[in-house]
Each structure stands twice: as C-alpha cells, then as structure tokens.
Amino acid sequence: MKKENQSFNLDFILLGVTSQQEQNNVFFVIFLCIYPITLTGNLLIILAICADIRLHNPMYFLLANLSLVDIIFSSVTIPKVLANHLLGSKFISFGGCLMQMYFMIALAKADSYTLAAMAYDRAVAISCPLHYTTIMSPRSCILLIAGSWVIGNTSALPHTLLTASLSFCGNQEVANFYCDIMPLLKLSCSDVHFNVKMMYLGVGVFSLPLLCIIVSYVQVFSTVFQVPSTKSLFKAFCTCGSHLTVVFLYYGTTMGMYFRPLTSYSPKDAVITVMYVAVTPALNPFIYSLRNWDMKAALQKLFSKRISS
C-alpha cells in the first residue's frame, strides 16, 4: 500500500522528443505550427460536411468522425507540450499521466476502427452499389461509429488500471513528450510481464482494423479490375487513394513503434511518435480535400458563405 501511495503522489518528468534542449526548441516550434493547422483543417472538414447537404452520406459521416477523433487526439498531448515548454516545466502528475495514456490509447483505437469502417464503406459502394443504401443505412453508420468509440475506451481501460497498479520506486523520467505506455513500463520497478502481455494483446486488437482494411481493398480492386474500363479504374483510385494514403501514414508509424519487443524501445523512438501524434492528424484534412472534388466544392461554398456574411 505504501508503494501504491508513493506512486500516486509521484510527478513524472517528460523528457521531450529528444534529450537535447536545442532540438526540443525546434520541436516546440513544429508543434506550435502544426497544432493550429490540425484544429483548423479538421474543424473545416466537419463544418463543410455539416453545411453541405450533398455530403450527408456515410462516407462523409465517417470522415467527419475521423476529423473529430484527430482533433481530440492531438489535443490530449500537444497543448501540454506547449504549456510545459513556455512555463519551463517538464512535470506531469501521476493522475494526469494516466489520463493522457488512457485517452491516447482509446483515441488511437477509435481512429483505427474508423479507418476500417471507411474502407468497408468504399468496398460496399464499389462491390455492391445496388445494396449500398441498405447496407450502409444511417443506423449502420451510427453503430460503426459508436462501436469504434466503445472498443477504443474498453481497450484503454485495462491498460490504464494495470499501469496505475505499478510501482515506480521514485523513477520519474519518461523518455517521451507524453505518457506513452512503453516508456512507462520500462520505467516501472514492478514485474511488468502481465502488462506486456496485455499490451501485445492490445496490439492485436489494434491490428484487426488493418486486416479489415486489407480485405476491403482486395474486394474493391478485384471488382474494379473485372470491369475493362480505364475510367472506372481511375475513379476507384481517386475515391480510395486518399484513404489509403492516410492508412499507410497512420499504420506505417504505429507499426514501427509498437510491433516489436519492449526491450527494443529507446528514447530516440519518441521522434517516431511525433509522426502519428502530430503530423498525421494535420495532414489528413489536406489529403482528403486535395483529391476530392465534392469536398473542395463544399469548402469553397463554406468560405463564400463566411465572406458574404
């Protein structure tokens, strides 16, 4: 009990992206530039979808949810990084650290399952166009979105509770700019074997959406290649290209971080986390709007309304 009380009274020290202060100053500027872009870009996507009745369909409903997840995902960590840098502090409370870890895991899972739902939506639209409105009904969309949030939160809870039960024996220095599960497990002086097993189980849960995405796109392209039409092929690539780009960005960075043994983790890996915590959520609005004529038109309409009013 004494050890548990000591842990709950412990303040962690977030070492930042690197151990070099000059490099952390550079990352501060990067975060300071990226965060407003993330908020503005994703908020514009949500507003454009809400304002344009032509975008009131499953594909854009799922995209709006992805933008919402990305806004919250970035807001869990980046404001704390910016505030600590400005205040000259690196501290975060034990409770604050656990909350940060909980939301990061929950939102990462919600993000991955939303990406899977978007791939499923495209597969149904291209492979079963006559049954699309029946399969992707408003009720189905709500269930897919609700399911992604429920799975995310239920996946994050056991990891958070297990981490809360660990002792840290005064070890305070977290080798990252936020409370990630891997540096916390390496920091603990308790037996973390069960925690590690649960973490790998969580990685498995995280991998399921990727499997769904692969199956969905195999179905999409097998359908498209059966139709001897260059126009159909081009349309499929335009429709799915943006989503596939986001999937590669998201899973490429997270797999490089978590699909490996805990012992291989090093402080240098914090640089990788910048990619999926800050860069990917900022790029998503540009990726989805640059190659999507309907989204471009909706954004232009939104801006013209704001200017005229």
Swiss-Prot record:
Which top-level group of life is the source organism from? Eukaryota
Molecular-function GO terms, alphabetical? G protein-coupled receptor activity; olfactory receptor activity
Cystine links in this protein are C97-C189
Give the record's keywords alphabetically.
Cell membrane, Disulfide bond, G-protein coupled receptor, Glycoprotein, Membrane, Olfaction, Receptor, Sensory transduction, Transducer, Transmembrane, Transmembrane helix
One of the record's GO cellular component terms: plasma membrane
Cell location: Cell membrane
Stated name of the protein? Olfactory receptor 1A2
Q: Which species is the source of this protein? A: Homo sapiens
